[in-house]
Amino acid sequence: MSTYIPIHDRPPHYANLPSPPSNSRQPRPPRYSSPDIDPDIPLARMSSAHESDPSEQANATQSGDYVPRQRVGSQGAEQEGQSRKRARTSPSHSGGNGSYVPRQRTEESHHSHHNGHSGHAQSDQHGNGQVYRPRHGQAPLTGSIFNLSPRNPFTSVVGDFIMNAAMGHSNVEIELKLGTFMTPSMPGQQPRRINMPTLSEMIIPHDYPNGPFVSTINHLHHRTLNELLNRAVESQSTHPTGRLYFSRSKLADSFYDHSEHGHGKVRVSRDMDNGHVVQAVEKRRIADLNVYCPGMAYDFRISVNTETPCEVPTGNAKSVRYKDRACYRHQVCRVDLTSVFSSNPRNADVPPSRSFELEIEVLDVPALLAEGAAQSERFDEILQNVLDSARMLVKNI
C-alpha cells in the first residue's frame, strides 16, 4: 500500500512527462509583442544557444516553418533598412505633451487642395494600392431611412415662438437684430459677453439669468457689411429671381413716452430733407427670443412687436434719433444697415452719441402667419431664409 502524500506536497502533474530531446529541430513558436512595441522587433528568445546557431535557422527556413527576423544592434538595423512603421514623435517634437503631429502633405495633395478638390479623393490610397475617385451618377439620398426629412428643430422652435407670440395681435412686426448678450453685472463691474456651454448656435431659455442685450455693432463691422451687401447688389443685378434691391433713407425718429392709451412708446418718423411726417406708430414689444452664437462676433435677438398707427402727439419728444439707413430688400426680408445719431432734447447735459445697427425685418408678416396657421412647408422656408441671411452676415464679419 502506497504512502499517502498531502496534496500540497505532491509534485505537479506534468513532472513525470518526458522532456523533449535537447537536439530538437523544431523552432520555438513566435512570440508576439504588445501593440506598444514595434512588431518588427521580436522579443528575445529564452534560449540564446538556439538563436546563435545559424544552421538550425537555415534548416527551419527550408522546412517551411516561420522564423522571425533577428536584428543584432545597429548593424542589423542598417541591413534590414528603415522600419515600415512611422516613427513615433517624441515629446520634444510634439510641443512637449506627446500630441499628434500631422503628416506633411505631398506635392500632389497640396496641388489638389488648391484646385478645390479634396486631397483624399485625389491622393489617398487604399491598402490594395487603388486610388479613390468619387463616383458619378449616384442616386440622390431620400432624407432618412423612412424617406422623410424631419423638421429642423431650430426652425421649429423659432416658428412656434412666433405663432404663440403673435396670436391675438394685429399690426405685427417681426425683426431680427444683431448684438451681444452680456452677463449680469454689479455696479462698478465691467460687463462682458456671456459664455454658454455650447459649440453651435443656441436658443437661450427665457428664464436664463443673462444681462442686457447690446443691439449695436462695431463701426468697422458696419463698413464691412455695407461693402459686402453693395457687392451683392452689383453681382445680382442681372438675376431674374432672387435679386437684392438697394434703397436709402434719412429719417429723424422722435420718441414720446406713451400714447393716449398708455400701452407703449410712440415713434414719429420725419423725412430729414423736407421735415414731412412719414410715419407715426405706437410700438409695443410682445416677446423676444435670444440666440447665442459662440465663436461669432455677434448674437441675435428675434422680436415680435406691434406697430399700431396713431396720431402725432403734442409736446416735446423724449429723445430723437437721426438715422442714415441703407436698405437691402430681398424676397422675404429686408436688411437695414443704420448709422444712428442720438440726442436728448430734454437734457442738454447728456452728450449726443453715435451707434451702428443691423436688423432684418420680415416683409409680409400676415402672409407668414397665414402659412404658419396652415402648417405649410412654406412657413419653414421663409423662416429658414431669414435665419440663413442673419447667419451669412455674421459669418462674413
Swiss-Prot record:
Family matches, as CDD domains: CYTH-like_mRNA_RTPase
Cofactor(s) this protein requires: Mg(2+)
Molecular function GO labels: mRNA 5'-triphosphate monophosphatase activity; polynucleotide 5'-phosphatase activity
Primary location: nucleus
Protein's cellular compartments: Nucleus
TM regions (residue ranges): none
Annotated region (Disordered), positions in chain: 1-149
UniProt keyword terms in alphabetical order: Hydrolase, mRNA capping, mRNA processing, Nucleus
Gene Ontology CC annotation, any one: mRNA capping enzyme complex
One Pfam family cited in the UniProt record for this chain: mRNA_triPase
Any GO BP: 7-methylguanosine mRNA capping
SUPFAM superfamilies named among the record's database cross-references: CYTH-like phosphatases (SSF55154)
UniProt biased composition (Polar residues): 55-64
Record-listed E.C. numbers: 3.6.1.74
Cysteine-cysteine disulfides: none
Family recorded in the similarity comment: Belongs to the fungal TPase family.
Assembly information from the UniProt record: Heterodimer. The mRNA-capping enzyme is composed of two separate chains alpha and beta, respectively a mRNA guanylyltransferase and an mRNA 5'-triphosphate monophosphatase.
The protein's role, per its UniProt record: First step of mRNA capping. Converts the 5'-triphosphate end of a nascent mRNA chain into a diphosphate end.
Identification of the protein by name: mRNA-capping enzyme subunit beta
Protein's organism: Cryptococcus neoformans var. neoformans serotype D (strain JEC21 / ATCC MYA-565)
Lineage, highest ranks first: Eukaryota, Fungi, Dikarya, Basidiomycota, Agaricomycotina
Name of the coding gene: CET1
